[in-house]
A protein has these predicted regions:
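Acidic/His-rich, divalent-metal-binding segments that scaffold phosphate/diphosphate chemistry
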Residues: 1-91, 130
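Generic alpha-helical secondary structure signal
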Residues: 3-7, 17, 114-118, 144, ...
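Alpha-helical protein-protein interaction elements
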Residues: 15, 28, 165-172
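Divalent metal-dependent catalytic cores for phosphoryl transfer on phosphate-bearing substrates
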Residues: 53-167
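N-terminal intrinsically disordered, cationic/polar leader segments
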Residues: 148, 170-178
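Terminal helices and disordered tails flanking the catalytic cores of nucleotide-processing hydrolases
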Residues: 178-184
């Protein structure tokens, strides 16, 4: 509903066919979660659904900001992770790339509110939740915290889904999982 955020969404998802094509095909990771073609889109839609839930249940959350941040939170992975069949990490970090893209897009939109731009960029920068997990910022607003929680939940639940699917009928203890930092 917010006209400025709608314009950013249109710039990428309506007007930029190259971005849309890459976004649909890319993985969300090399091997940890959603490490398959289309994984980025699947992960993004799952995170966005969870963020929609948060926005409905916590009225103080700025819904349009949160949904926009959810749709763009991992956009930098298109540049950070090489295309298939390589699907390997490049030197660029997706958090910084995504934040920079949002800043550049906001700068192209006349009268884009500075506070709204800062909040959107903050959500992107803080979506890993902790500095030791790669976030240059920790969540300082409700939208950033909700995005972090949705991103973390989807990544971990998808990881467990993949682990248990590979285990097949062997549903006993499978051993230590590095990403979960626990025996599963």
């Amino acid at each position: 509903q917010n006209k400025y955020l709608r314009k950013i969404l249109e710039m990428y998802f309506v007007e930029n066919k190259e971005f849309v094509d890459a976004f649909k095909k890319h993985s969300a990771a090399k091997s940890v979660h959603h490490g398959f073609m289309g994984g980025l889109l699947e992960h993004t839609l799952s995170v966005t659904d969870m963020c929609q839930y948060f926005a409905e249940h916590y009225p103080m959350i700025h819904r349009d900001l949160l949904i926009t941040a959810a749709l763009f939170h991992d956009m930098g992975k298109i540049q950070e992770i090489s295309d298939f069949p390589m699907n390997d990490y490049t030197d660029d970090g997706h958090i910084y790339i995504g934040a920079r893209c949002m800043e550049n897009a906001a700068a192209q939109i006349p009268n884009f509110p500075p506070k709204l731009k800062n909040e959107l960029v903050h959500c992107i920068l803080a979506h890993h939740g902790k500095m030791e997990f790669g976030s240059p910022k920790v969540p300082a607003i409700m939208e950033a915290m909700a995005l972090h929680m949705a991103d973390n939940a989807d990544a971990k639940l998808q990881t467990l889904t993949e682990v248990f699917t590979q285990a097949g009928d062997n549903m006993g203890w499978l051993g230590y999982n590095r990403f979960m930092e626990s025996n599963v």
